[in-house]
Amino acid sequence: MSGLRISDPSKLHLKKELTHIRKVASKGLRDPGTTSSWKSPLTSSRFVVEPPASNNVEILSNNQLDSQFPSSRVFGNNGKEKEKKVFLYNWKTQRTSSEKTEGEDETSWIQASLNDDDDDDDDVSDARNGGDSCLEETRSASMIRKSGFIKKKSKELDLSIGRKSTAKARNFPSHHLHVASGLSVVRDESDETEDFSNSENFPTKVSSPLLLKLKRKNWSRSSSKFLRGTSKREDSSHTCNSTPALSTSSYNMYGIRNPSTVGSWEDGDDELDDDNLDFKGRQGCGIPFYWTKRNLKHRGGCRSCCSPSFSDTLRRKGSSILCGSQSVYRRHRHSSGRFNKQKLALRSAKGVLPLLKYGGDSRGGSSIGIGYSDDDLSTDFGEIDLEAQSRLDGRRWSSCCKSQDGEREEEEEGGSTPESIQSLSQKYKPMFFDELIGQSIVVQSLMNAVKKGRVAHVYLFQGPRGTGKTSTARILSAALNCDVVTEEMKPCGYCKECSDYMLGKSRDLLELDAGKKNGAEKVRYLLKKLLTLAPQSSQRYKVFVIDECHLLPSRTWLSLLKFLENPLQKFVFVCITTDLDNVPRTIQSRCQKYIFNKVRDGDIVVRLRKIASDENLDVESQALDLIALNADGSLRDAETMLEQLSLMGKRITVDLVNELVGVVSDDKLLELLELALSSDTAETVKKARELLDLGADPILMMSQLASLIMDIIAGAYKALDEKYSEAFLDRRNLTEADLERLKHALKLLSEAEKQLRVSTDRSTWFIATLLQLGSMPSPGTTHTGSSRRQSSRATEESISREVIAYKQRSGLQCSNTASPTSIRKSGNLVREVKLSSSSSEVLESDTSMASHDDTTASTMTLTCRNSEKLNDIWIKCVDRCHSKTLKQLLYAHGKLLSISEVEGILVAYIAFGEGEIKARAERFVSSITNSIEMVLRRNVEVRIILLSETELLNSKQTRQIAVTTSSYTESGNEIPMKRIEAIIQEQRLETEWLQKTPGSQGRLKPERNQILPQEDTNGVKVLKICEMGEFQENQSGKRMEHCPVSPSLLHNSNFTNNKDNLGYESESGRGVCSLLFCWNTQKSPRRTKIKGTSMRSRRSRERRFSLFSACARPRK
């Protein structure tokens, strides 16, 4: 080897041939060590260039290479001379038709480069270093022909490089640079060679001669000399590295290259004066020439291993590495440094770390025969990594071309295998029909359709998000193309098509999203292509899934409608939508529609419990229930919440779920509701502000309160806290009044929520709504079941309250002989309610009255003996009346006889003694009925009857005696009798004057809800004073002063005849009237017969003024 010189003229004729080979290799090959995504192509079988008809090749050694280059011809086994053809193989899977077209273009481009003889010697690339890789069959080790002069050759070459100059660099014989790696030339072989097959799969086990030689030789020592020789001449145009000439300048899918490493292939020698990494045709290992000896000495004894091409991938793979090639894309001259920086940052973010980033991952202790471990190498190569990372660009091989062993490649690079997926919703997504949850009807229908072959051309899946619509469409696609011929459930999961589906590589499924950019245009383009296709018979189904189809424009729907009119066989469309209203009716009527309902909370909890068990998550059972409740029927949302909670790194509890979702716990809501209903204003405001300060949403809290109240009313709520178990929240302990309060609160919350959504200050109005819950009407004033009830209560004056209180203390009793004369029922069975003290229930307890069956009685007799309940009911009914005039009328003349129940309706019988009073009371039946219903809280029918005069007077006398007796026995704290009589007198005179005076009702403002008489009367109809005794005697027998008598009674003949019985007596002893304020305008014919009497003389004798006295009538 010492005889060979660079300037040897006998070797100059090989330079041009080698230049073309270098250019081809540099354009087609790529250094596997400069990209972290490179993998050992042990099972790869895809070619960059289409191979010839014969796939058999023969590996030539370096000696054969030197002998073959002068003639530029190669010979096959048959001894015939053939044209030299150099093919560059990329060990990947078979390519598609479009890729094959590119491969043919690349083949013609490569052949054109080989036949180009016009290029001069200025085109120099870094393939001088043995850029052509060798292919070797591992089954036959004898095929590798060792050359014994490699070591000598490398030594002599190192010395020659040190003495060469820049001018002589261009004349250096290129074939001397290939001794370190060996160049293999592939040529055609016959089909009978046993070492290689004609199938698509290339040999599965191959090894690089470079690595074999590195194992057999002391590579580190020889290569270190190359590095030392390189560092002596930094301005040299040649680089003598120990690695093959592979590219550090890679191509991305768009052909854009880094301007620092990429340039025109036709540039000349003017580039040789720059840094070798900045050569526009540079394809070196990545180490710049400005690396000094000092930098190399820092690496110690392994300075020869500084080439970035020997990355961690090389050291792990060992001798099973083959250099691949990448498709040459169209080159662009325009690019920017900022673009490359962004691309580099993007690759770093994705985990694409070039060179020796993973050098610390040692697998055995030493690296390629060097006496240093991987950890030492990773430390030494740190500076190289930084330099190479800033200069390398390109695209990961796994994204450019896929191999047949793609699933293993994705597993190594963190692909889409279940073990590497982080999202629980994707990891546990349904893959078969039986894994779909909550959609039993849809699953059964689709399974039967696949089994019977009755598949529709268009399906429409409608339902909320997260219910399994897209997963069902994918499973349907796999089931249609499953190769299982038995009656097993499809998809089976183990045939080839099902395997591709489970790996996400199904060729028969196309998913389009109308919500994405240009999604609608893609759907329209697809339909346009399908409409132009001729009908053809196919064995496989093509399934097109259109997600968010309600976003498609009208013209796309028209295209789909045309497809439905003339559908193609084996083509199925699955339209998925969450808004069925925006899908045209014509489309809905022409497709099979499946409704995906919300998943039940119980099914969600079962699924979450299984996931938590598989993932070893510590979750409370109540927390899973709360997650399912807040998921709102979406299984995907529930799985997402569970994943978020699992990232907290602690036990998943109910409080943690509430904090994540942003809702208030039920315990706090119960406490707030109880405070609001109890009318505790201060505590309600304080508690509400505490919850709002924690970040709770007022609208959400209002919805929670409404849901809580509905659960309590329905009896479906179970209090978790013991202190609420016996409270009013328990449905069994709720009274009718409590239910009414809850219903009223629910109504207020529903109305306030509508106003709260449009309010700007939601917190304030939320608290105001809570305060309204405590101001609800009491159960006694709750109106139930009558269209005639009134909504407001009139204010009560002191006179009414005092009289009622006095009557309640006096213990009035009805007469023992009081009974209705006749109560007739035609054809109805009457059930009488006897309200005696022994047989009636307390009506104040808001319960219905007990009834007794009496199927034989057509009339009823009420014994009023000791009937305190009847009196209490009647007093309460009178108190409920809004008109003071009506109150006085009922209290003075009315009497509650009985309450009967006829066919479920209560009938109250009210008796009056006079026909005129009865007629007047009948005009106020609605008000009387309303007041009685408010007391009894039942629908009541009021019937007014007329009692005989004798019975009424006897009842009055009995009541008067009772009042007189009780007034003396209960002296002390009782109200004075005279004061009560004076107040009643003033009130009745005022009422009578208002009713009689013309226009007084128009001038005076009536009371609230006062019911005035509807008819005008000429005579004055005043109330009788039946409660107070007219004659009261003390123990000495003296008669008390007489009470004033109503003028209407004085003009009543019946009253005059029975005056003695009633206890009325004229003050003067004469039956004359003072005519002052007397409404008896008619002159009596008897007045002319009165003699010797005058008003003045009478007044003078009586020495006092009497407003009302007996009218001037002759005494009998």
From Swiss-Prot:
Which residues are noted in the entry as ATP-binding? Answer: G463, P464, R465, G466, T467, G468, K469, T470
Bias class Acidic residues marks the residues at: 115-124
Classification via InterPro entries? AAA+_ATPase, DNA_pol3_clamp-load_cplx_C, DNA_pol_III_gamma-3, DNA_pol_III_sug/sutau_N, DNA_Rep/Repair_Clamp_Loader, DnaA_N-like_STI, HLD_clamp_pol_III_gamma_tau, P-loop_NTPase
Report residue spans for region: Disordered.
Answer: 95-138, 225-244, 777-798
Q: Which residues bind Zn(2+)?
A: C482, C492, C495, C498
* Record keyword Plastid present: no
Give a GO molecular function annotation for the protein.
DNA binding
Write out the entry's keywords from A to Z: ATP-binding, Coiled coil, Metal-binding, Nucleotide-binding, Repeat, Zinc
Q: Which GO terms describe its biological process?
A: DNA replication
Q: Which sequence ranges form a coiled-coil region, renumbered to this chain? A: 726-760
What residue intervals hold the motif PEST 2? Answer: 402-422
Under the heading Gene3D superfamilies, the entry gives:
1.10.8.60, 1.20.272.10, P-loop containing nucleotide triphosphate hydrolases
**What family does this chain come from, according to its entry?**
Belongs to the DnaX/STICHEL family.
Q: Extract the PANTHER family matched here.
A: PROTEIN STICHEL-LIKE 1, REPLICATION FACTOR C / DNA POLYMERASE III GAMMA-TAU SUBUNIT
- Protein name, UniProt field: Protein STICHEL-like 1
Originating species: Arabidopsis thaliana
Lineage of the source organism? Answer: Eukaryota, Viridiplantae, Streptophyta, Embryophyta, Tracheophyta
